[in-house]
Curated annotation (Swiss-Prot):
Membrane topology: Multi-pass membrane protein
Family annotation (Gene3D superfamilies): Rhodopsin 7-helix transmembrane proteins
Biological function: Photoreceptor required for image-forming vision at low light intensity. Can use both retinal and 3-dehydroretinal as visual pigment. Light-induced isomerization of 11-cis to all-trans retinal triggers a conformational change that activates signaling via G-proteins. Signaling via GNAQ probably mediates the activation of phospholipase C.
PROSITE patterns: G_PROTEIN_RECEP_F1_1, G_PROTEIN_RECEP_F1_2, OPSIN
Carbohydrate attachment residues: 165
Record's protein name: Rhodopsin
Residue intervals on the Extracellular side: 1-18, 79-92, 156-182, 268-278
PTM entry text: Contains one covalently linked retinal chromophore.
Subunit record text: Homodimer. Interacts with GNAQ.
Species: Orconectes australis (Southern cave crayfish)
Length: 301
């Protein structure tokens, strides 16, 4: 109770119907996420033709999503059943840390997947191909930096506290001190604004490069009096473009999933009078659903 911000005490308990609804949602989402990401990992690790450096990033994405739901799913089921957080202060902090860690690792894995697509499509043969060593280094960098940022609240830079709905825990976005707010400013930039800027830049350049390539192909075909110049290399380029569209869709879905949680944090900092416990549930709903999207998108590919 000492970790719950005074802001939440002004609200009555949530409508009891919200808890079974959230429980059912988490049950469905949890099963789909764990099964989907497990299958993704298993297929990529056991199919020799898929064990490429680029697909190591896909496996890392599936692992971060799997780990997120594996650690979030059971506690959420318990708290929804009891209508409040019953797992203690220490586990509340661990729970929030793991959620932030997996979310951070997920988005930066998507950023590196996007950058790899950029390197392949835009730079082509002039670009340095992704090696297993480089992909492994990228993955290690993702997890080390994500861990560094997410462990900071344990040492006094912000803190992990129960959410207003009391079914989960997250960063403290209601405290007014500059130390707590500075963490949220920098962390929001690190896990949202910077990745978004990099992703938008990469895809703008990719779209321009693909458009220029297609125009060149059409112009050359007209000069030669044929319908198409498509050859094996062109078909390969087309396949790379399809992969880029898949990656772009996945990144877009990730941002749709995490934007509500970002807004909750910023509303909590600057306009908390508008923030009720019920609204904080939407951050959970969208963020947890994100872990289901990725295996579906890559299975289609």
């Amino acid at each position: 109770l000492h970790m719950i911000h005074l802001h939440w005490y002004q609200y009555p308990p949530m409508n009891p119907i919200m808890y079974p609804l959230l429980l059912v949602f988490m049950l469905i989402t949890g099963i789909l996420c764990l099964a989907g990401n497990f299958v993704t990992i298993w297929v990529f690790m056991n199919t020799k033709s898929l064990r490429t450096p680029a697909n190591l990033l896909v496996v890392n994405l599936a692992m971060s999503d799997f780990l997120m739901m594996f650690t979030m799913f059971p506690p959420m089921m318990i708290t929804c059943y009891y209508h409040t957080w019953t797992l203690g202060a220490t586990f509340c902090q661990v729970y929030a840390f793991l959620g932030n860690l997996c979310g951070c690792a997920s988005i930066w894995t998507m950023v590196f997947i996007t950058f790899d697509r950029y390197n392949v499509i835009v730079k082509g043969v002039a670009g340095e191909p992704l090696s297993t060593k480089k992909a492994t280094l990228w993955i290690l960098t993702i997890w080390i930096l994500s861990t560094t940022w997410c462990v900071a609240p344990f040492f006094g830079w912000n803190r992990y506290v129960p959410e207003g709905n009391l079914t989960g825990c997250g960063t403290d976005y209601l405290s007014q001190d500059i130390l707590s707010r500075s963490y949220l400013y920098i962390y929001s930039t690190w896990v949202y604004f910077l990745p978004l800027a990099i992703t938008i830049y990469c895809y703008v350049v990719i779209i321009k490069a693909v458009a220029a390539h297609e125009k060149g192909m059409r112009d050359q075909a007209k000069k030669m009096g044929i319908k198409s110049l498509r050859n094996e290399e062109a078909q390969k380029t087309s396949a790379e473009c399809r992969l880029a569209k898949i990656a772009m869709t996945t990144v877009a879905l990730w941002f749709i999933a995490w934007t509500p949680y970002l807004l909750i944090n910023w509303v909590g900092m600057f306009a908390r009078s508008y923030l009720s416990p019920v609204y904080t549930i939407w951050g959970y709903v969208f963020a947890k659903a994100n872990a289901v999207y990725n295996p579906i998108v890559y299975a289609i590919s």
